[in-house]
Every structure is written in structure tokens, then in C-alpha cells.
């Protein structure tokens, strides 16, 4: 491949920060919706599954509707991934946030079972289907867009900002539900209070749409289109054939990221209440505080990944959880509240290493002309199989074995596999150009360096197989 210095991408670091905010809004909205739904399952069950007498079964049906969203994510990943690789990243990100906002608003407006009968749960299910479908193209698109718009030397530190949106969305949901339950009676919450957060989600979506409409297309995508007119000539089977190793590493990385993520954010609150016997308010405050502390930790580890390489930060997380997961769950069974807090915050500490590195690292595993669709499909299949099922698997393990430490064994096993795969198969790409692309630089000094060292600028040429 001939080197053309004119194709080196000069990017503005300040604009890159704005792209993080605009794309992070989508993450915030996704997790705000997830958090609100999780916190209001009892009210949703009472409104949409009222003929069911058992509260436990109503809750199961409510969670089943939530699980449907995960099953639709891979389909959304395929559709939006193909569109994103062919027509651009921006068009998808603009579309997904509209669909997400609409589905969230719909849930808040739906009549109850007592008003329209069986249509109520059916419409709830359809709203969750739309949410899952749109989310399937959202996160992979956000990661891709930020990675392609950031200077290579700051890709992880800027990418970690996406997870700030994730954490902020969940924190906002927790705080809003806490305020509503404080100011409203239980009857008012069951009647109309639970709907308020879903209705307010519309404004978050409109704000995100406003920001995203002002975005420009990523420089990497524009450069790729300009230099490779016949770029979209490979199908999924060929992608798997040529890049199965990269797909496998990405799949495993998403597994250990999401199993840890859902273990801490989705399962741990239930574990603390049902097994450890903490009250709901204390549990909510603890989990919210953990996520708040993870925000500066994620930013710190993102900067560290740019300096020492994301592979080493991955290994800090997987290695740490290999050693600490069982200890952490043992600490949760302590009679000391302080010791319990240490166990929870320890899990959050190691999770923050993933929050910091995943957004900036996963897009680097694939070439520009196949990046969106391959990342989107791989990410969403992995999340659907392992991420969304984590609370269910953890609950089943405790019930089946009778061992309250069973979830820790599961987390340890996943972490060991992740540690081995990253150690032996992952190549650190921190500071390097994205595969299939010329370098992204934000100063003339870096540009001059790559002009003098073209082989380092196009380090990926020898690896490309299609």
C-alpha cells in the first residue's frame, strides 16, 4: 500500500471532547431507562400484569419483558451495523437516539391492563422490542464514532467518557426514583409516579438528538470512503473467515466486561437485599455511591491506558477480579458494615478498569470498512448471551448449590478466561492508528513523525487479510 501523507487525519481534541458528550448522551439514556425499569418493576408488574395474583410471577413477567430487549440487540446490531459501514456513523447515531427516546416515552404513556386488557402487556413488550433493537446499534456506534474522531494518543482517555454517560444515567435513575418515593406515597407511585421518569426520558433524548445533529461525520470514515471507493464488498461469512481471531478476542472481552458490569449494577443490589439482608435504601445508596466513585476511576484508568497500553489495564482488571472476586463476596458476609463497603467498592474498582478501556479498545480490533457491523454484532451477541443473563445465572447458581459464594466463582472463572485470552491473543493498540486507517493526530509534531515513519503509520497493512 502506497503511503500518502495527505491522508493523515488532523483532528481537533476539543471537538473530540464534544463528540464524547454527544455520543455519551445515548449511553446515559440507555442506562437511565434500564435503571428506571429495574427500580419500578413492582409498579410496572402491578399495572401491566394485574390479573396475575402472585407478586413474584408478576415480577418475573416484568423482567421477561426486559430480557426481550437483549434478544433483539443482535438484530439491531446487524441492521444498524450494515447501515453504519455503508452510509456513515452519524446517520445511525441520529436514528437510534430517536428510537430509544420514543420507546422510553411510550412506556410512560401506556394504559394499564385494567384500561385496555391484554393489549397493555403486548404494547409494553413491543416498546421493549423497539428499545432493544435501537440499543443494538447505539453503543457500538458510539464507540466507533468516538474512536474514529479522537487523536490516537488520547483514544482511551476520551473513550472512557462514554462510560461516564453509562454511569451517570444509572445514577440519575437511582436518584430520581429515590426522590419520587420520598415525596409520593406508595399509592401515588403505583398510580402515576412510576411513569414520570419514563416521560422525562423524552427530554434527554431530544437533547441528545440536538447535540448529535451538530456532529460531523468521523474523519476516519470520510477518509476511508474517499480512498477506497469499493469498500463494502465483504459479507459476514467472509469477515468471520478472515478475522475470527479478532472476533473471538472481542467477544471474550465483552463477556468479562459485561458479566462484571451486570454482576455489580444489576445483581448485587438483589444479593445485598435477599442474601445479606441489607435494607433497600442502604443498598441503593451503596450502589449509587460505587458508581459515582467509578467515574473518576474510569477517567484515571483511561489516561493510564493511553500511557502504558490498554492491554496492561485489561490485565489489572481481569487479574484483580481473578484474585479478589471470592474475597469480595466473603467480605459481604461480614457483620461489619465497613467491611461490606470495602467488598462492594473493591468490585467497583476493578470494574472501572473495563469502563475505562473498552470504548477506546474494542473498535481498534477491526478494520474501518467492517468496523461498525463486526463490532456491533459481536458486542451484542456477547451481551445478549452473557451480560443480560448474569443476574439470572447468579441467582440460579445460589439456588442450585446453596452456596452464597457461587456468583463469585462464576465471576472468577470468567475473569481467568479473560486474563488468558488477553495475555496471549490481544495486541495492544494504544497510541497506534486504527486498523485500515491513517493516523489521527492533533499536532504537527505527530504528523511529521508519521511522514518520516510511514511503516508505523500503516502498521496494520501486513495483518489485513481480505
Swiss-Prot record:
PROSITE patterns, per database record: MFS, SUGAR_TRANSPORT_2
Gene3D superfamilies for the chain: MFS general substrate transporter like domains (1.20.1250.20)
Cellular-component GO terms for this entry: plasma membrane
Highest taxon of source: Bacteria
A single GO molecular function term of this UniProt record: symporter activity
Keywords: Cell membrane, Membrane, Symport, Transmembrane, Transmembrane helix, Transport
UniProt keyword Transport present: yes
Function: May be a proton symporter involved in the uptake of osmolytes such as proline and glycine betaine.
PANTHER family xrefs: ALPHA-KETOGLUTARATE PERMEASE
Family indicated by similarity: Belongs to the major facilitator superfamily. Metabolite:H+ Symporter (MHS) family (TC 2.A.1.6) family.
Name listed for the protein in its UniProt record: Putative proline/betaine transporter
Amino acid at each position: 500500500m502506497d503511503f500518502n501523507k495527505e491522508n493523515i487525519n488532523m483532528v481537533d481534541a476539543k471537538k473530540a471532547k464534544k463528540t464524547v458528550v454527544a455520543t455519551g448522551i445515548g449511553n446515559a439514556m440507555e442506562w437511565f431507562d434500564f435503571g428506571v425499569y429495574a427500580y419500578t418493576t413492582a409498579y410496572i408488574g402491578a399495572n401491566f400484569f394485574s390479573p396475575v395474583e402472585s407478586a413474584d410471577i408478576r415480577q418475573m413477567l416484568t423482567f421477561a419483558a426486559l430480557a426481550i430487549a437483549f434478544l433483539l440487540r443482535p438484530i439491531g446490531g446487524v441492521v444498524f451495523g450494515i447501515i453504519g459501514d455503508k452510509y456513515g456513523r452519524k446517520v445511525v447515531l441520529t436514528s437510534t437516539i430517536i428510537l430509544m427516546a420514543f420507546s422510553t416515552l411510550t412506556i410512560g404513556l401506556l394504559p394499564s391492563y385494567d384500561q385496555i386488557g391484554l393489549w397493555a402487556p403486548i404494547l409494553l413488550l413491543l416498546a421493549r422490542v423497539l428499545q432493544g433493537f435501537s440499543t443494538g446499534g447505539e453503543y457500538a456506534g458510539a464507540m466507533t464514532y468516538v474512536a474514529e474522531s479522537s487523536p490516537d494518543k488520547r483514544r482511551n482517555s476520551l473513550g472512557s467518557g462514554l462510560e461516564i454517560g453509562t454511569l451517570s444515567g444509572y445514577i440519575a435513575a437511582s436518584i430520581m426514583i429515590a426522590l419520587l418515593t420520598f415525596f409520593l406515597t406508595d399509592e401515588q407511585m403505583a398510580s402515576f409516579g412510576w411513569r414520570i421518569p419514563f416521560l422525562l426520558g423524552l427530554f434527554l433524548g431530544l437533547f441528545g438528538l440536538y447535540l448529535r445533529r451538530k456532529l460531523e461525520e468521523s474523519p476516519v470514515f470520510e477518509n476511508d470512503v474517499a480512498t477506497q471507493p469499493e469498500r463494502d464488498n465483504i459479507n459476514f461469512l467472509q469477515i468471520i473467515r478472515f478475522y475470527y481471531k479478532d472476533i473471538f478476542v472481542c467477544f471474550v472481552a465483552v463477556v468479562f466486561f459485561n458479566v462484571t458490569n451486570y454482576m455489580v449494577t444489576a445483581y448485587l443490589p438483589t444479593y445485598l437485599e435477599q442474601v445479606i439482608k441489607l435494607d433497600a435504601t442502604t443498598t441503593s445508596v451503596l450502589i449509587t455511591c460505587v458508581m459515582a466513585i467509578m467515574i473518576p476511576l474510569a477517567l484515571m484508568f483511561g489516561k493510564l491506558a493511553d500511557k502504558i497500553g490498554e492491554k496492561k489495564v485489561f490485565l489489572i482488571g481481569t487479574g484483580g477480579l481473578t484474585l479478589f472476586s471470592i474475597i469480595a463476596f466473603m467480605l459481604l458476609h461480614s457483620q461489619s458494615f465497613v467491611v461490606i463497603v470495602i467488598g462492594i467498592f473493591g468490585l467497583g474498582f476493578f470494574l472501572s478498569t473495563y469502563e475505562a478501556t473498552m470504548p477506546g479498545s474494542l473498535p481498534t480490533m477491526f478494520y474501518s470498512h467492517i468496523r461498525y457491523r463486526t463490532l456491533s454484532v459481536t458486542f451484542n451477541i456477547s451481551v445478549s448471551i452473557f451480560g443480560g443473563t448474569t443476574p439470572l445465572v447468579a441467582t440460579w447458581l445460589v439456588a442450585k448449590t446453596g452456596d452464597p459464594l457461587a456468583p463469585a466463582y462464576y465471576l472468577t472463572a470468567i475473569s481467568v478466561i479473560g486474563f488468558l485470552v488477553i495475555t496471549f491473543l490481544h495486541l495492544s493498540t494504544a497510541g497506534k492508528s486504527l486498523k485500515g486507517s491513517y493516523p489521527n493526530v492533533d499536532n504537527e509534531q505527530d504528523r511529521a513523525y508519521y511522514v518520516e515513519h510511514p511503516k508505523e503509520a500503516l502498521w496494520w497493512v501486513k495483518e489485513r487479510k481480505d
